[in-house]
């Protein structure tokens, strides 16, 4: 493919494709900003292809929106879950495609159009999206409450590891035709199909390729030969998204290929269950009015503020009187057995970490799927097949996510090497820069 996703006039070109490898995912943003500053990326209308088991699309809840215009301050405010949206509000990213594995389904599948702007009442960044992902964090506000609005197109696309068929004859066991597929699932269409699986593959529309893929197990089996699954993505659809932008960044979190929920190892099953009860966000119904949505968000914000205050107070002292006082509040009764269990296991519980764990227990758990070697390899092939049909990115960013235990530490190096080999096969020599053990540039 050509090495541009759209008009690149006036932009500088890297001699070799730069690939930056960091540890924590928010550490990639300084490299992207540096590319904007050096005119390798445009300052606006950038498409962002994000392969990850987590969307990373939350927003620093209390950060003033204008912080995005002071990059040094901004970089210090960001965390692994909230570093993309500030770049949207700053006007840099106009399209985000979240490619996710089958075990990560935090945001509704398909295309989302919404606004990102400054909340006039709080001066913080907020969105008009009503997806549960944003509602559960209290990030929704009505459109008329936002100023300096930036439109965002978010496409959520599922990538399935393509299973190699095992019924080949032995002399066909090694075949160059074992090609992966990309799956795009539209949750609204799922119920209307009689598919055993929710998605079809992404293939080039050539007879040659279709015949090449006969050795692959279908990822979607329909009950009727005449019925087609209405959930297939085409390369053309993704290309159309990229054509709308001036350039695109390829971003890969290694936990896309294998992921842990680190909090499950920090707490007992009973403690984790209590956290889910305390922090749960009940999914609202459909056909809600704007007033209903505002009420839901207000209730959720107060719930989270009360929980934050509770565990902040416990950091100062977790005597029985303090615990009972907080547990007397509605819905907080299970705080007593939680604290008792924590104190049995550790001399001084880390209540700040308890709160951080609780924040991940809203309407769904964090994804947890430790992949087999074969699953990792099949996902690598799926990503390779997708990317080879797309233009070349301007730059690539990679997050290891292993020190915080999201990508299993015993797999991360192998996954990283596989990803780098995939990139070399796609793009040739790379300008590889590893900052995983260092501070990223300012």
From Swiss-Prot:
* InterPro entries for the chain: UPF0489 (IPR024131)
Q: Which gene encodes it?
A: C5orf22
Q: Which domain of life is it from?
A: Eukaryota
Show the segment(s) annotated as Disordered: 175-210
Q: Which organism is it from?
A: Homo sapiens (Human)
Pfam families noted in UniProt: UPF0489
Q: Which family does it belong to?
A: Belongs to the UPF0489 family.
Know the name of this protein? UPF0489 protein C5orf22
Q: Where is the composition biased (Polar residues)?
A: 189-200
């Amino acid at each position: 493919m050509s090495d541009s996703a759209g008009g690149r006039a006036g932009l500088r070109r890297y001699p070799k494709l730069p690939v930056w490898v960091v540890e924590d995912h928010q550490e990639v943003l300084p490299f992207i900003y540096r590319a904007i500053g050096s005119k390798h990326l445009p300052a606006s209308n950038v498409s962002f292809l994000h392969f990850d088991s987590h969307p990373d699309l939350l927003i620093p809840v209390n950060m003033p929106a204008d912080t995005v215009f002071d990059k040094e301050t901004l970089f210090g405010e960001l965390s692994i879950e909230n570093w993309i949206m500030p770049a949207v509000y700053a006007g840099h990213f106009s399209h985000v495609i979240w490619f996710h594995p089958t075990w990560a389904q935090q945001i509704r599948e398909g295309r989302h159009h919404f606004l990102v702007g400054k909340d006039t009442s709080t001066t913080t960044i907020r969105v008009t999206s009503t997806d549960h992902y944003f509602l559960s964090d209290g990030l929704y506000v009505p459109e008329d409450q936002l100023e300096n609005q930036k439109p965002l197109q978010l496409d959520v696309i599922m990538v399935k590891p393509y299973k190699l068929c095992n019924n080949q004859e032995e002399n066909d066991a090694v075949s160059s035709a074992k090609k992966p597929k990309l799956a795009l699932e539209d949750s609204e269409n799922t119920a209307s199909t009689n598919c055993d699986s929710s998605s079809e593959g992404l293939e080039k529309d050539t007879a040659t390729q279709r015949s090449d893929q006969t050795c692959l197990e279908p990822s979607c089996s329909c009950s009727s030969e005449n019925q087609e699954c209405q959930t297939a993505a085409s390369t053309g659809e993704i290309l159309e998204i990229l054509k709308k932008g001036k350039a695109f960044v390829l971003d890969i979190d290694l936990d896309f290929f294998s992921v842990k929920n680190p909090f499950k190892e920090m707490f007992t099953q009973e403690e984790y269950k209590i956290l889910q009860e305390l922090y749960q966000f009940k999914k609202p119904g459909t056909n809600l009015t704007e007033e209903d949505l505002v009420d839901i968000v207000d209730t959720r914000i107060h719930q989270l503020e009360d929980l934050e205050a509770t565990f902040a107070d416990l950091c100062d002292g977790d005597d029985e009187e303090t615990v009972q006082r907080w547990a007397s509040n509605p819905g907080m009764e299970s705080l007593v057995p939680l604290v008792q269990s924590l104190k049995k296991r550790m001399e001084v519980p880390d209540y700040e970490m308890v709160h951080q764990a609780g924040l991940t227990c809203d309407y769904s758990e964090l994804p947890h799927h430790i992949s087999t070697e074969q699953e990792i390899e099949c996902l690598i092939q799926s990503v390779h097949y997708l990317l080879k049909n797309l233009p070349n990115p301007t730059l690539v960013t990679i997050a290891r996510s292993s020190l915080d235990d999201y990508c299993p530490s015993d797999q991360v190096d192998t996954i990283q090497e596989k990803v780098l080999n995939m990139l070399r096969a796609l793009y040739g020599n790379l300008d590889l820069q590893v900052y995983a053990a260092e501070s990223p540039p300012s």
